[in-house]
Curated annotation (Swiss-Prot):
Entry's Gene Ontology cellular component terms: membrane; viral envelope; virion membrane
Taxonomic source organism: Rabbitpox virus (strain Utrecht) (RPV)
Induction: Expressed in the late phase of the viral replicative cycle.
Gene name in the database record: OPG105
Gene Ontology BP term (one): symbiont entry into host cell
Native organism taxonomy: Viruses, Varidnaviria, Bamfordvirae, Nucleocytoviricota, Pokkesviricetes
Family stated for the protein in its record: Belongs to the alpha-carbonic anhydrase family.
Residue ranges occupied by any Alpha-carbonic anhydrase domain in the UniProt entry: 1-235
Intravirion membrane side: 295-304
Name of this chain's protein: Cell surface-binding protein OPG105
Protein role: Binds to chondroitin sulfate on the cell surface to provide virion attachment to target cell.
Post-translational modification, as annotated: Apparently non-glycosylated.
Keywords: Disulfide bond, Host-virus interaction, Membrane, Transmembrane, Transmembrane helix, Viral attachment to host cell, Viral envelope protein, Virion, Virus entry into host cell
Amino acid sequence: MPQQLSPINIETKKAISNARLKPLDIHYNESKPTTIQNTGKLVRINFKGGYISGGFLPNEYVLSSLHIYWGKEDDYGSNHLIDVYKYSGEINLVHWNKKKYSSYEEAKKHDDGLIIISIFLQVSDHKNVYFQKIVNQLDSIRSANTSAPFDSVFYLDNLLPSTLDYFTYLGTTINHSADAAWIIFPTPINIHSDQLSKFRTLLSSSNHDGKPHYITENYRNPYKLNDDTQVYYSGEIIRAATTSPARDNYFMRWLSDLRETCFSYYQKYIEGNKTFAIIAIVFVFILTAILFLMSRRYSREKQN
């Protein structure tokens, strides 16, 4: 079977509970950002120090870099989806097996070489003071293919979500250059719209017409699951952690289930009946928009 391409849509109903998935031991207290880059496609922060262990990991995996993804609008921008729900953005933390391999370049040649942690970003009404430390560095890398020292004290632990239960599956890096095991925290961290919009002002490496282009979006759409791909989760409370406000009443749950059905039809027919697949994905987008607007209204009512 071919390797499962990343990203994917995680269907919580089909995820398999695995009691052997112990909590991760995250040791970012000694991690220090060294440089921040505008690659022309994304924002990358390189790190020195920091590692993860525990969980299902055979040994320590050291932190290499952080990548950030976003979309044109605040309501979509994540690579991975949870029950067809897209978050505002996504952070990927790339780690490599230092105990077994001599370098990152060597590690990525092997199926046990890379571990990527995914953290979702969700736009809210309040600024994230820890995420702001990254935003403050963006003016120094506004042009494509530029790099600058990360000149602020930054503690990566502060960007971890409040709940560290996780999904995991075997896939690839986002650019499909290497195999990778994914650890996905379904509980997002909150940021402000103004913070996310700053990323859309970065210049892209695309310059085919001689005019400046901006990285208005860089997320990837999900790939269909292979028949043998298994998604596992680490605990029962994960289902509660992935529940969005759009599922807090019967009608919204019904809309969400209908959206999932349409998305499954899209995945089923994309290789055959493309017309039917297009109709299905259009319904997915429409239902997603309705759920988003109803979710926003629910949040405002709850605050009031």
